[in-house]
């Protein structure tokens, strides 16, 4: 098994706003898929080499964004500051600036939906 985690969902209150936010900060298209009923998902751009962990923005009556609980670390690329600099102009908030960690660098932000998220790069 290559990865312990292979998929994640980011809940949204306003699906279109969340898709625009992640498209803006990650610099790639969010691909929207209708799931039927009140459910939609927006596939995040996958920047990993040769596949790997992926995720999507979810929209359903059960979607409940949160700044508590599990925190997802997105790939910050070669310099996560490039992505972090786009967070506030896109409507999010930087909670912890780029910080040296044992495995490289990390930063924490909240998205437009109120989800606490992080960036990491080695």
Where are these regions (language model features)?
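Short hydrophobic/aromatic beta-strand element in the GNAT-like acyltransferase core
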Residues: 41, 54, 106-108
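Conserved beta-strand in the GNAT
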Residues: 55-58, 118-120
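Core segments of cupin and vicinal oxygen chelate
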Residues: 2, 9-52
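Short, well-ordered turn and helix-capping elements at secondary-structure junctions
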Residues: 57-61, 78, 96-98, 102
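Vicinal oxygen chelate
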Residues: 3, 5-13, 31-35, 60-122
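Short secondary-structure boundary/capping segments
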Residues: 45-49, 61-64, 98
């Amino acid at each position: 098994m290559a990865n312990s985690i292979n998929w994640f969902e980011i809940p949204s209150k306003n699906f279109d706003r969340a898709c625009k936010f992640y498209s803006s900060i990650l610099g790639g298209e969010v691909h929207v898929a209708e799931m039927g009923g009140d459910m939609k998902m927006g596939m995040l751009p996958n920047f990993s080499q040769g596949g790997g962990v992926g995720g999507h923005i979810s929209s359903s009556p059960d979607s409940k964004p949160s700044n508590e609980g599990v925190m997802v670390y997105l790939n910050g690329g070669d310099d996560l500051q490039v992505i972090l600099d786009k967070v506030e102009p896109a409507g999010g908030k930087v909670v912890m600036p780029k910080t040296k960690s044992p495995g490289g660098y990390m930063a924490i932000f909240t998205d437009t939906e109120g989800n606490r998220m992080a960036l990491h790069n080695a």
